């Protein structure tokens, strides 16, 4: 049984959050929203604040999940990240980067693979 896209995305974000916690990241925010857009996960990795876009798919039939992150989407994430940085007044305290996490599910959702792409894009 397939879930709707929102459920798939939410499930993938939970998998991604667990994955990065187990990798030593500290999650600061999930689903940070503002008028400019949304960032799936904001986390701290040593001296970096990391803005993470999570893409979840059933397989690679339409290409890799990260290929769905267009320049327009990257720009939206960047602008949202800028607002977050200003709101939290952290611009002089950390380095910043943009990561992507790909979650590939099987048709039963019982098995999955996770791929972390550090510094996936820069604006």
Swiss-Prot record:
Alphabetized GO MF terms: nucleic acid binding
Gene3D superfamilies hit by this protein: 3.40.1350.10
Protein family: Belongs to the UPF0102 family.
HAMAP family for this protein: UPF0102
Name recorded for this polypeptide: UPF0102 protein CLK_1817
UniProt source species: Clostridium botulinum (strain Loch Maree / Type A3)
